[in-house]
Amino acid sequence: MLLLLMLLPCPSAAQKKEMSQARTILKSKKGADQAERLMTGLLKDSANRENKRIYAIWYESVLMQYQAVNEKLYMKQKQDTAQFFELTRRLFSVAEALDSLDMRPDKKGRVDPEYRADNAEQLMKFRPNLLNACIYFVRKSDFQRAYQFSEAYMDCARQPLFAGYHLDSIDTRMPEAAYWATYSAYRMSDPVLTLRHRHLALRDTSKTEFTLQYMAEARRLLKDDSLYMETLRLGFSRNPTNTYFFPRLMDYYTAHGDNEAALGVVNRALEADGSSTLYLFAKSTVLFNMGRYDECIALSDSLISMNDSLPDPYYNAGTAYLNKALKLHPLRQKKQMRQVYQKARPYMERYRQLAPDQQRKWGPVLYRIYLNLNMGRQFDEIDQLLKTLR
């Protein structure tokens, strides 16, 4: 039995042999990837995972690969840029694992890190490449990897390895990294990840409006109506002319019948740009929905005077006149009703000319106008048209 035990390989001896072999490889300045494989092979055995020397050799082997690729890139030699960035991220990951072991107290409770200072100083020089990698992968539309690199960049701030650098307070690029994380998560249609770094991303003031858009979309996907609207209102208050926030606020208020709120939004937008045909038309529609037909018609006429080729102001004015006519008594106010229909007619006929494919909109209105004006030929034509649409 004793002889058998002596013949069996000793785990510690095998470990020392592979560590020694890896050191020899690294000294030769060649085959760093082989040295890395030796160390990752040792770490498959859970008994080796507390040995910081293994992690130190692993770190050195990745560092050597990183430096070799970096030198080729510097010399403008053909090299896989994505591989270089992956080596960067792996270097940080290994260093952080090593640091967690390095900071463990000894048997007397003393903490005396052996590697932290040198590794942290070295990695701080490489850290910008984590953010460069993020931007690189965004441009490649590889948003999953872009997100991972932006997180790796920001994560340094919470890692004890970099505690002495106070990254949370002095790193001015942290909001930029948070923005790219938010954007990448948005492009992956992951609402939870989109919102994860929102507070930090909002500190990148050059991209605040975009961040708020991504936040709004995330909250919409999460069906959180109150926070969705809160985000839309915040974005609109910052920039009333932004093409994202205005139409969505208007759509929401219109769908919920809150015309007063919709009017408030469009009036605020007009304060920012009083000549916008979009905002003027939106206001005419709100006024129509509120039953303020004369104001709707006046505003539609203003829009037509600005641009007589826009179809929708004609429709708003024509239907406003129609609704005014419908409020009149068909017997006691017959003459007045006919006059209103006569006013509605040119608007709706012009709308038909400008939007011939919108038959379901102008067809029923012209049907009622021609009927009440006793315009037999025109009425018959519209009547036949509507029958084909049924």
Where are these regions (language model features)?
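Terminal, low-structured helical/coil segments at or just beyond the last alpha-helical repeat
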Residues: 235, 323, 338-390
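Post-signal peptide N-terminal segment of secreted/secretory-pathway proteins
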Residues: 26-142
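Single-residue signature of alpha-solenoid repeat helices
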Residues: 35, 88-91, 146, 194, ...
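Short coil turns that delineate tetratricopeptide repeat
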Residues: 46-49, 158, 205-206, 240-241, ...
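Structural register within alpha-helical repeat arrays
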Residues: 21-22, 58, 62-65, 126, ...
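Short coil/turn linking the two alpha-helices of tandem helical-hairpin repeats
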Residues: 29, 64-74, 139-141, 161, ...
